[in-house]
Amino acid sequence: MRNSYRLLGALGALLMILPTTLSAQSNSLSAFSPYTFYGLGDMSVQGSAFFRSMGGAGVAYSNYLHMNSLNPASYASVMPRSGLFNVGGEMYNTYANTADAKTSYNTLNIRDVNMLIPLAKGLGFGFTMTPLSDVGYRVKMTEMDPLILANVGNVVYEYLGEGNTTQFKFGLGWNPFKNFAFGVDVIYYHGIITRNFNTIVTPVISETTERTLYGTQRETYSQAGVILGAQYNLFADELRQFTIGVTYRPRVNLRPKATRSIVAQA
């Protein structure tokens, strides 16, 4: 009964913080990056700051002081009558200058939310919400083809995109016997990416001053998946620990539901 109250309390606290976190993650962290022009955008290094400092490595890590969202088997290491809660942040500072102008872009955002609570001895429940990818770009190009300039006029192309995809993990880790644990995470992928493309034509000969073509594409991602994980301690003492960890994530096809609209204005 006590574990049930503990789980309900943790879920209640989680529901209170989720709207704020989702709102914060609706802005692209890697804004104005040309690498986010196609597909899902810039893929995020997985794990909390503790694991990201190692390039996302850590499927074999198991410690009651840190939640390891990379391997659900590690959830079994949580101590009884305790719990772990972590909120991470991320900040980008971009500066660019030329001989005539300079610009800067700064953003601060909540990056991930992790929660780990014990359900029974050797059994832990974990929740993670973390970004999977970010999209943010703004590109403006001017047509330089002499043939188009002579027959159509001055043409300017504008491309603007923003959005992200987020993954939610709910999982259990169980330690059935000494030195071995396994676990499973159920993942829900969700994201919205908006891409705008505009073409502005200024004729050279025609009496029409300007013609504009506005286009918008909205991509919605919604898919589920799983992660299976296992860990085995070969040996452990007060000074050393050697653990083998493996994970398996079946392939998930993240195809978006896309809606596109194009409006011409003369």
Show where each model-derived region lies.
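N-terminal, post-signal peptide beta-strand-biased segments of exported outer-membrane/organellar beta-barrel
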Residues: L22-S133
